Amino acid sequence: MCSWSLSSHTLTSPVRQAAMEPKSSSCGGAGIRLRLLVVLHLLLLVPSSAMAFNYADALAKSIIFFEGQRSGKLPPGNRMPWRADSGLTDGAQYNVDLVGGYYDAGDNVKFGLPMAFSTTMLAWSVLDFGKFMGAELPNARAAVRWGADYLLKAATATPGALYVQVADPNQDHRCWERPEDMDTPRSVYRVTADKPGSDVAGETAAALAASSMVFRRADPAYSARLLHAATQVFDFADRHRGSYSDSLASSVCPFYCSYSGYHDELLWGASWLHRASRNASFMSYVEANGMQLGAGDDDYSFSWDDKRVGTKVLLAKGFLRNRLHGLELYKAHSDSYICSLVPGTASFQSRYTPGGLLYREGSSNMQYVTTATFLMLAYAKYLRSSGATASCGDGGGGARGEVSAAELVAVAKRQVDYILGKNPAGMSYMVGFGCRYPRRAHHRGASMPSVRAHPGRISCDAGFGYLHSGEPNPNVLVGAVVGGPDSRDAFADDRGNFAQSEPATYINAPLVGALAYFAGTTK
């Protein structure tokens, strides 16, 4: 397969490179390129089963992407050599250490809500599909720990406060700068009893709790610290209710407003704490507060903002495996959501592009594709382990009334294969995977010469020349999955089209689990 080798290249390509192909790619010259186009056209006509992908390679790259998003002091083994240390004084002006964590997407802000969600989903990927990760399991754990370390600092630095953001996004977005030499204000934002943020606190509790399970055997002392902090943060979220969007206003909106409110994060956080601690008080909380917090809501998406359907799938596991009848409602709602994704069922109500990609109106569609794919595979696992199916309602008129675990896996596989290259454009939407992939990801660090190639500072205004350049990115952000094509499968490889070309940690995090599953089960 035409693809970058993680062991044989520097992950950096020249700005001007013939045919925009990396030197270490096996893609050849003009004659080979023409033959490849013919072969690619033929490949699109063969059945899905005949178009094989190297899922293990895609898994490795989906994890290495997180190393390109790291903020702070980078370890010697960081596998994105064009990246360097950044944000080393974050929090210092407020006498708090907030060094580390992840930049969310293509900018240099550390947004707490999507970072916590990304960490939760990375942890869930390891918990449910870690056995399929093979040699990548240590790298996946390292990705979880990089996020969890930062969230632990943010949660414990100051009693009665949770630090939820570093940098003013309004100022950051006025510049196009590499993280290594950014000079925009590194303002710090926090939620307190007077300025609550139950949404971001609930998600942080979920992330810490899920991460504690990842390290329960590998590092018991660290695991215990994470779980203790998760319990405290959840208590803070529940005791001082309110949305961080109201408390912090334009500092977080419209960038990561909590549009769904905070009820979903409270139920999500309690559910993860129950799974991590096995403390019955958290299940009692779920049973007593579930309906008030959205257990009865109809919901058809799962994202950094809206956790309702993810919570239901998580809790449905308890019903399926342990027959906890207080959780039967969550099984019913999970069935409804899952069936809504599967064409031909009585409950089907999703939209797909002509090429077969799940599609939701709005920016960065791939975030919904990867979360839905993850939930289908997780739910398939829970159904299979209990010998159950998903009930889709009245199967009259030729519509199917139930869906099996195997059918869910097949639907999920089509989404993963679309991302990796089985689509009308014949391209991978993962940077560095395959012969054709996005060359102009909307990403500051990738789009500008690295500090190693160009040590001199590139100013705020000068950087915009790189944003608006039509040249491919000089640095390959290996493993990054971009926002993806539109409703007609059309994709503009345009750095200025952030809705389609910007990668994000919360796009990749759920995909890690899905790729692990197929890497471990596909022969």
From Swiss-Prot:
Reaction equations catalysed: Endohydrolysis of (1->4)-beta-D-glucosidic linkages in cellulose, lichenin and cereal beta-D-glucans
Keywords: Carbohydrate metabolism, Cell wall biogenesis/degradation, Cellulose degradation, Glycoprotein, Glycosidase, Hydrolase, Polysaccharide degradation, Secreted, Signal
Signal peptide: 1-52
Residues bearing carbohydrate: 279
Cellular component, GO annotation: extracellular region
Gene3D superfamilies: 1.50.10.10
The enzyme's E.C. designation: 3.2.1.4
GO biological process per UniProt: cell wall organization; cellulose catabolic process
Glycoprotein as UniProt keyword: yes
Record-annotated active site: 107, 442, 493, 502
Compartments it resides in: Secreted
Gene Ontology MF terms in the entry: cellulase activity
One family name in Pfam for this protein: Glyco_hydro_9
Family: Belongs to the glycosyl hydrolase 9 (cellulase E) family.
Listed name of the protein: Endoglucanase 19
